[in-house]
């Protein structure tokens, strides 16, 4: 056969007879149809296959078989050369088999080469040989089957390749395509694509029909020719098995086409190519975005629009961790935003987003992290453990607990050590309080305070602050040790020098530095004008007792200067010395006369005496005088001694002219009397200008010798009578008669004058007593005995009051407006006096309203009644008066209020830019005038007016709330008027409008030249107290000012009840010092609320001191000072109701240190009334508790809400309702729950009945919506006295959904008193709101049929446990429930309020605590037993504190 080309694979032929056999093939015979057999030689090989026909070949040998076939003679080619034979491309639809025969033969038995079969699919690479054979197989044909499982539309092509090795022959023949399965080679079922995520294992499972031989090889071939072996075989049946190939940890580059291949000597099975699809798990390209950060949360946006990797995304998760933490947490997210809860404050977090696609391992790597930090949170509490490790006289070394992060809750924090001490003012001045705050180094718990005063009580407080808040600890007192005292102030040394004595007085050292034990005084003479004194003299020392701050020096020398030193001593030693020089006075000269000397001689006109020289004392004698005195009418006091001397020089002629009884008869120099010398009196000579006239023989004479010393302007005289000359008898008798006449006239004149004075004095006393009785004896209303201390009014006080009234009566009434005249009359009537007036004190225990014990009531002035249309009202008649005014048809509150506006006008409107309202400008006469600023004469204006208080003129300043441009003026006024208290009765913003600008700093700020520093803030439920320190440039003094900010006045109208406002007024009164300046009161415009406050303050004092109230005339008076002080009729009525409440309730607060005795007295049963004070107080509470009308509970009474109420008798008022926020289908927002205030926080409690089966979902909505972190359960489940059963409303254990709320049980602990359960609550409809951790406290010690708990200690344990949890979780609200949400819940809330009262204000006020709760819901604390339990619980609590 010479045919060059044959059809190897024939077209498919369909036989009509359906006889099984080859559908196509190549037998290479001569008679075969060449059009049906087609093959081609390879182009990438070394030589071609040859068609061999044995009968026609010239090279035929005995080694070759007979017949026609394709052959390779390896002896003609070099080893390694290849020849390829390509068969026709096939595309089959059904199972088929390719069969061919081959032989390999070499005469020497060696391998002629190898025969390999390849199956190429869709023109792709050859891949590996699916079948191959080598070696000499004998001189015979062998049959092979190929089971190729590649079907249309795919196509495949078979390639036969012969590789030469040694001499021999390789031949193929009878290549047939059979339309039935192969018998020897297994057929693979269709191999499906495999999709995996990168990094996962991929498994190809090749299912085949047939029976594999033991020598069968199973391969997984990659499209590029790589081969994997080691497949596991599993027999599925008799003629069916599966081979599994696992590719481990596949990655994206391994994505390719793969097929299964079986190999044996009998043939090969080849599957179709299946694709291994490797998907890369997705990962975000960008980090998440931070939307908002808080102290314990971060709100982020996932930001997953752009990703790396493959989708689809079926799950999104957040992975977060603290930057330095080894842990991380992953949370599932189903929204584009998410709120991370319960984070640590001031902590940096790494937050990444994880995306997941379908399949195992579909979660991609975390995306780029968002690195964000939470904000700081307010410190958990103040630092504790403050103690002194070392105490010295001038320094303290202090230690305290280390400020750990769980306390600071911020890495950036500051520890301030604030201390204060009081030093006594020098010179009798006021005490000065030194305050200073020092910053402590970071991360230290030790500090040394230096430069402290010795032996002083130092009060120290630690303050822990960060950017979000500040926590101050309690003050701890330390006392420094003693030191040597400071010096006695030289200016405090006062002395009185005498001739031989000095009286010295001094003050205690300004800095005693301890307890003074003694004073030491030293003195020494250092100079003297007496030449006979030796100076300096010896130094002498005297010790004085600690309480002796004076000394009398005696036995000193006259005219001598002494150096005196004084110093104090403490246990530490002597202090500095105070020095002074004091000179004693010179003394009069002394004479050396024994008895009166006898005259040397005597004539009718002369007498001769012996003059002896005098001795100077402290100064020498400067001159001598001889003095003659007529004896007529003069009695001799003593025969010899010092007489009244004669310092005024008088000559004889001058004495005659003036009628003087004595004259100088001679003046002698000291030099003339160096020794005793005779001298004749009356010798008619002149001595130094003085005529020694002869003596009159008719008169008696006394002769005196006088010596005089002069030194530095100081003169001392001494004289002595040295002689007496008698007159003639006749002249003496005449003189005596004249003298007696003169004496009798003098006596009669004195008696007459004394009688006149006595008559006038008695008349004045009678008039004053009569007027005093008329003025004070009249009392229009009876007084309750014992209400006031009756202080007697002295004559001086009466006279002062009378004169004041007289002076006012002469005031020019024409200059006053009608309202002002009325106001003056009102103030006169109620004895309004100035601050400096003397006032009587009030006995606190007997006061009518329990006001401040420091209130001075003065006299009991009569009410304003005489001829008046609006008289004062007795307190006892006030309730009846108010009821009449509210129900009156002709004349009531409306008409009375409108009468205030008759004839009002404003004549002066100035400085409108500084006024908040044009029509509310203050009257200029009572306007506060500021000290003008330099260069600005108009800067004296501020919209503020003085208002009189009760018994205190200008006690208040009513002003508008400061605007931005008037803040400096406001603080100028506070400084100028020395104000201590500022009362603010407005919020900064109300109804969307700015009512008052924030005129105070958060820390410290300058307003002009005034520096305001916030010292501390105390926040209560209804008001806030801020304490400021004021300093002004150019002034050394510091002022302390307290702002009392009432925050509970509603934006519209007046408060529903006056309880909180009355407590607020009492707090301001007790906190304001008596010597402070006016109380500044402001709201927004300085009227309305301001007027209400002032009227209440004045009327409370009047009611207490006089037993009456004069509201109408008080309001009229206020309006004369500042216009429109009461703006609405509603405010006017509120004042009456508030005064009534104050009078009915009184003051019920008890200091902690007096509580035990007070409560014992309250329990004492009065023998007459057979009732105790405690019972009467509870009855009063019931009488003032408001009763709810149907209109006040309109929402609870709606038909759709009736089924949500456990009892229709216990409904919450509309004003206190806690409306639900979370929606649930068609359910409304009502739940039977009321908001209640605690002592420190408004709406801190939510009181509700035990949930009904149909309101459990509402209960959990309430807990979540209001951020309630605690639930207090005071009843037990399934109580038999309940109208409906008390069901369990929580899951235990596990997780349960109540409407939109999912509640997950976390843990439980229990003891004999309390079961504590922890839950996690979240809203599944709004997962972005995060989750809430709630702790439930189920109290077990309250029996079903008892009004009070079984154990007070157990109840205190409950209160402490809840309080501790609330501190740890950030002060969320507390839900309190019992069976009906009344008595038990009220007892718990009242007890909580009382504990806070004791902790922060050291007072107990059970009445106030319960009344505050009842103002919101009347059934709080229902029984007397529960009310008494509150008292006894306080007693138990105080006992526990003492034990600690």
Curated annotation (Swiss-Prot):
Organism: Danio rerio (Zebrafish)
Topology class, membrane: Single-pass type I membrane protein
Localization annotation: Cell junction; Cell membrane
Catalysed reactions, semicolon-separated: O-phospho-L-tyrosyl-[protein] + H2O = L-tyrosyl-[protein] + phosphate
Cysteines joined through disulfide linkages: 206-260
Domain Tyrosine-protein phosphatase residues, every copy: 886-1142, 1174-1437
Active-site residue numbers: 1083 (phosphocysteine intermediate), 1378 (phosphocysteine intermediate)
Protein's name according to its UniProt entry: Receptor-type tyrosine-protein phosphatase U
Annotated spans, Disordered: 830-866
Keyword Ribosomal protein: no
Anything else known: Embryos lacking ptpru display severe disruption of their segmental pattern and loss of cyclic gene expression in the presomitic mesoderm. Convergent extension during gastrulation is also affected.
Chain sites annotated for binding substrate: 1051, 1083-1089, 1127
Stretches that traverse the bilayer: 749-769
Gene that encodes the chain: ptpru
GO MF entry, a single one: protein tyrosine phosphatase activity
Domain Ig-like C2-type: 186-271
Domain MAM: 24-184
UniProt keyword annotations, A-Z: Cell adhesion, Cell junction, Cell membrane, Developmental protein, Differentiation, Disulfide bond, Glycoprotein, Hydrolase, Immunoglobulin domain, Membrane, Protein phosphatase, Receptor, Repeat, Signal, Transmembrane, Transmembrane helix
């Amino acid at each position: 056969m010479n045919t060059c080309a044959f059809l190897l694979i024939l077209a498919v032929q369909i036989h009509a007879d359906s006889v099984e056999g080859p559908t196509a093939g190549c037998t290479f015979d001569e008679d075969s149809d060449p059009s049906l057999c087609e093959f081609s030689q390879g182009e990438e090989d070394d030589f071609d296959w040859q068609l061999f026909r044995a009968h026609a070949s010239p090279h035929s040998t005995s080694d070759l078989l007979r017949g026609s076939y394709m052959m390779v003679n390896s002896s003609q080619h070099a080893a390694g050369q290849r020849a390829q034979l390509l068969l026709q491309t096939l595309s089959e639809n059904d199972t088929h088999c390719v069969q061919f025969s081959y032989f390999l033969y070499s005469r020497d038995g060696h391998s002629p080469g190898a025969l390999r079969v390849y199956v190429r699919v869709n023109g792709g690479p050859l891949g590996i040989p699916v079948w191959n054979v080598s070696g000499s197989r004998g001189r015979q044909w062998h049959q092979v089957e190929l089971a190729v499982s590649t079907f249309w539309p795919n196509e495949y092509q078979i390639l036969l390749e012969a590789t030469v090795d040694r001499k021999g022959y390789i031949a193929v023949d009878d290549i047939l395509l059979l339309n039935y399965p192969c018998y020897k080679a297994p057929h693979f079922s269709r191999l499906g694509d495999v999709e995996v995520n990168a990094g996962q294992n991929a498994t190809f499972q090749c299912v085949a029909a047939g029976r594999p031989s033991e020598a069968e090889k199973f391969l997984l071939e990659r499209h590029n020719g790589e081969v994997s072996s080691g497949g596991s075989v599993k027999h599925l049946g008799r003629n069916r098995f599966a081979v599994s190939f696992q590719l481990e940890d596949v990655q994206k580059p391994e994505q390719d086409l793969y097929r299964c291949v079986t190999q044996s000597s009998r043939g090969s099975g080849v599957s179709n190519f299946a694709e291994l699809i490797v998907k890369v798990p997705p990962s975000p390209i960008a980090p998440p975005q931070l939307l908002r950060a808080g102290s314990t949360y971060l709100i982020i946006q996932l930001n997953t629009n752009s990703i790396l990797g493959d989708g689809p995304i079926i799950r999104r998760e957040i992975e977060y961790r603290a930057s330095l933490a080894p842990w991380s947490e992953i949370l599932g997210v189903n929204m584009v935003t998410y709120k991370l809860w319960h984070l640590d404050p001031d902590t940096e977090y790494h937050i990444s987003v994880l995306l997941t696609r379908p399949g195992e391992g579909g979660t991609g790597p975390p995306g780029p992290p968002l690195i964000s930090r939470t904000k700081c949170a307010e410190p958990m509490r103040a630092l504790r453990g403050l103690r002194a490790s070392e105490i010295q006289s001038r320094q303290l070394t202090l230690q305290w607990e280390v400020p750990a992060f769980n306390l600071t809750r911020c890495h950036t924090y500051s520890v301030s050590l604030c201390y204060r001490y009081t030093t006594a003012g020098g010179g009798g001045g006021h005490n000065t309080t030194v305050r200073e705050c020092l910053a402590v180094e970071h991360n230290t718990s030790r500090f040394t305070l230096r430069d402290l005063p010795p032996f002083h009580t130092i009060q120290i407080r630690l303050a822990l602050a960060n950017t979000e808040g500040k926590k101050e600890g309690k003050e701890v007192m330390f006392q420094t040790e003693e030191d040597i005292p400071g010096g006695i102030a030289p200016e405090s040394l006062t002395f009185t020098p005498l001739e031989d004595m000095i009286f010295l007085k001094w003050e205690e050292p300004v800095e005693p530095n301890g307890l003074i034990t003694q004073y030491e005084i030293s003195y020494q003479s250092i100079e003297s004008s007496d030449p006979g004194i030796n100076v300096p003299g010896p130094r002498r020392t005297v010790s004085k007792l600690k309480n002796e701050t004076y000394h009398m020096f005696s036995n000193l020398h006259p005219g001598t200067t002494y150096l005196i030193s004084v110093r104090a001593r403490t246990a530490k030693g002597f202090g500095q010395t105070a020095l002074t020089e004091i000179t004693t006075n010179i003394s009069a000269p002394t004479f050396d006369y024994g008895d009166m000397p006898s005259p040397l001689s005597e004539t009718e006109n002369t007498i001769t005496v012996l003059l002896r020289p005098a001795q100077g004392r402290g100064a020498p004698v400067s001159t001598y005088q001889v003095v003659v005195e007529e004896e007529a009418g003069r009695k001799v006091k003593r025969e010899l001694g010092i007489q009244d001397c004669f310092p005024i020089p008088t000559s004889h002629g001058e004495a005659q002219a003036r009628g003087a009884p004595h004259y100088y008869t001679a003046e002698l120099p000291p030099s003339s009397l160096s020794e005793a010398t005779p001298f004749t009196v009356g010798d008619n000579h002149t001595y130094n200008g003085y005529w020694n006239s002869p003596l009159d023989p008719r008169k008696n004479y006394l002769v005196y010798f006088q010596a005089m010393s002069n030194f530095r302007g100081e003169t001392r005289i001494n004289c002595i009578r040295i002689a007496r000359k008698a007159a003639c008898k006749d002249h003496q008798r005449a003189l005596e008669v004249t003298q007696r006449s003169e004496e009798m006239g003098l006596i009669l004149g004195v008696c007459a004058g004394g009688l006149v004075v006595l008559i006038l004095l008695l008349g004045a006393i009678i008039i004053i007593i009569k007027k005093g009785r008329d003025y004070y004896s009249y009392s229009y209303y009876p007084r309750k005995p014992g209400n006031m201390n009756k202080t007697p009014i002295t004559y001086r006080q009466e006279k002062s009051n009378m004169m004041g009234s007289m002076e006012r009566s002469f005031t020019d009434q024409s200059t006053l407006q009608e309202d002002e005249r009325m106001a003056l009359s009102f103030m006169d009537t109620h004895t309004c006096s100035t601050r400096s007036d003397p006032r009587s004190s009030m006995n606190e225990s007997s006061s009518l309203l329990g006001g401040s014990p420091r209130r001075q009531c003065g006299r009991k002035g009569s009410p304003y009644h005489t001829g008046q249309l609006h008289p004062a009202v007795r307190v006892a008649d006030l309730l009846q008066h108010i009821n009449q005014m509210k129900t009156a048809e002709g004349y009531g509150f409306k008409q009375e209020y409108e009468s205030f506006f008759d004839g009002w006008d404003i004549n002066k409107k100035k400085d409108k830019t500084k006024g908040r309202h044009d029509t509310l400008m203050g009257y200029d006469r009572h306007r506060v005038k500021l000290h003008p600023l330099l260069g600005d004469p108009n800067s004296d204006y501020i919209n503020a007016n003085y208002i009189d208080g009760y018994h205190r003129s200008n006690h208040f300043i009513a002003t508008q709330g400061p605007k931005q441009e008037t803040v400096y003026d406001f603080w100028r006024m506070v400084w100028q008027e020395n104000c201590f208290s500022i009362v603010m009765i407005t919020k900064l913003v109300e109804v969307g409008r700015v009512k008052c600008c924030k005129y105070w700093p958060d820390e410290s700020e300058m307003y002009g030249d005034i520096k305001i520093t916030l010292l501390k803030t105390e926040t209560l439920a209804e008001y806030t107290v801020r304490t400021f320190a004021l300093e002004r440039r150019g002034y050394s003094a510091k002022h302390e000012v307290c702002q009392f900010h009432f925050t509970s006045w509603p934006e519209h109208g007046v408060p529903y009840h006056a309880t909180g406002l009355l407590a607020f007024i009492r707090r301001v009164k007790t906190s304001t010092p008596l010597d402070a300046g006016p109380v500044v009161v402001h709201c927004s415009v300085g009227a309305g609320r301001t007027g209400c406050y002032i009227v209440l303050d004045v009327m409370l004092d009047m009611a207490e001191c006089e037993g009456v109230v004069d509201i109408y005339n008080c309001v009229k008076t206020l309006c004369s000072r500042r216009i429109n002080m009461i703006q609405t009729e509603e405010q006017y009525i509120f004042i009456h109701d508030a005064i009534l409440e104050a009078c009915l309730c009184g003051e019920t607060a008890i200091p902690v240190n007096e509580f035990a005795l007070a409560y014992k007295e309250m329990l004492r049963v009065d023998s007459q009334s057979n009732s105790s004070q405690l019972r009467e107080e509870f009855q009063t509470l019931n009488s003032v508790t408001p009763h709810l009308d149907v209109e006040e509970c309109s929402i609870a009474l709606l038909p759709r809400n009736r089924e949500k109420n456990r009892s229709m008798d216990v409904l919450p008022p509309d004003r206190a309702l806690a409306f639900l926020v979370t929606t649930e289908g068609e359910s409304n927002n009502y739940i039977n729950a009321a908001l209640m205030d605690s002592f420190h926080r408004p709406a801190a409690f939510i009181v509700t009945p035990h949930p009904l089966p149909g309101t459990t979902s509402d209960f959990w909505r309430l807990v979540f919506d209001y951020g309630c972190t605690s639930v207090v359960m005071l009843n037990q489940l399934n109580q038999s006295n309940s109208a409906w059963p008390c069901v369990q409303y929580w899951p235990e254990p596990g997780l349960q959904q109540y409407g939109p709320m999912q509640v997950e049980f976390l843990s439980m602990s229990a003891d004999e008193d309390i079961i504590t359960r922890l839950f996690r609550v979240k809203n599944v409809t709004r997962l972005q709101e995060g989750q809430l951790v709630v702790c439930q406290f189920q109290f077990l010690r309250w029996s079903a049929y008892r009004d009070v708990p079984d154990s007070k200690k157990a109840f205190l344990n409950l209160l402490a446990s809840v309080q501790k949890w609330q501190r740890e979780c950030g002060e969320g609200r507390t839900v309190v429930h019992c069976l009906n949400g009344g008595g038990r819940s009220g007892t718990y809330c009242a007890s909580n309020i009382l504990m806070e009262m004791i902790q922060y204000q050291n007072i107990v006020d059970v009445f106030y605590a319960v009344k505050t709760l009842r103002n919101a819901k009347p059934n709080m604390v229902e029984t007397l037993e529960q009310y008494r339990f509150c008292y006894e619980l306080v007693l138990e609590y105080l006992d526990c504190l003492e034990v600690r």
